[in-house]
Amino acid sequence: MRVSSPQGKFADGAARVDRQVLVRSEAWGKHLLHHYESGLVVHVHLGLYGSFTESAIPMGEPVGQVRMRLAGADFGTDLRGPTACEVLTAPEVGALVDRLGPDPLRRGADPDRAWRRIHRSRRPIGSLLMDQQVIAGVGNVYRAEVLYRHGIAPQRPGTALALDEWEALWADLVQLMRVGVRRGKMHVVRPEHDHGEPSYAPDRPRTYVYRRAGAPCRICGTPVAHSVLEGRNLFWCPACQPK
């Protein structure tokens, strides 16, 4: 694999893994790990604005601020705008993973680890679901939609969540996120509630509440509410998710 940093910010890191065999890639929550034959690992976190774009070999001149370029035999990819792009050793990867909560997409993930933190916390469940040290990988869309699907107000404290409610939330997150990976897009509206109404934006999945502030709830017609919780937009139905 040829690894470079056209932008220059990752030049030293790229040189450490350039011309090595990329053995495997894996994700832990929102953290992408590229494992190279030397044992070094490139850690990428896209954040809100990062993205990969793929193209066939030979790749053209870099466009924009390309943090990392990977070029294989037939295809390559450019990384732009990540929150993190760094080379880690095996112990550093272990420390990173140890800081994360269970990932619904990983087989063997233990939801009890998350439950032990949730049921002792007075923070809102809407905050806890987005805390990567509690659960790894849940973003704003899944947070809003899974709480709606189970009639749970995002403002409810973790201490007020029952174990059976948490078990149902976890099982639903596992199913929804795996479907999203398999299909390449999110599917969160149950078939019986999906009557083909437009999404909140072109080429985006239809949702119950996410990005639908002021629009009627798909089930009860109550206007979807919006607020900001810990710096992130929050959406819910006041009738279907009573406080």
Q: Could you tell me what each predicted segment is?
A:
Residues 49, 73-75, 80, 86, ...:
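Generic hydrophobic/packing signal
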Residues 1-100, 238-243:
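Acidic, proline/glycine-enriched N-terminal capping motif
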Residues 83-123:
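A short, charged helix-loop
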Residues 56-59, 96-107, 156-163:
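Short histidine-centered catalytic/ligand-binding loop motif
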Residues 60-64, 73, 108, 119, ...:
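Short, amphipathic alpha-helical segments
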Residues 2-18, 26, 31, 115-243:
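Basic, nucleic-acid-binding surfaces and adjacent catalytic neighborhoods in DNA/RNA-processing proteins
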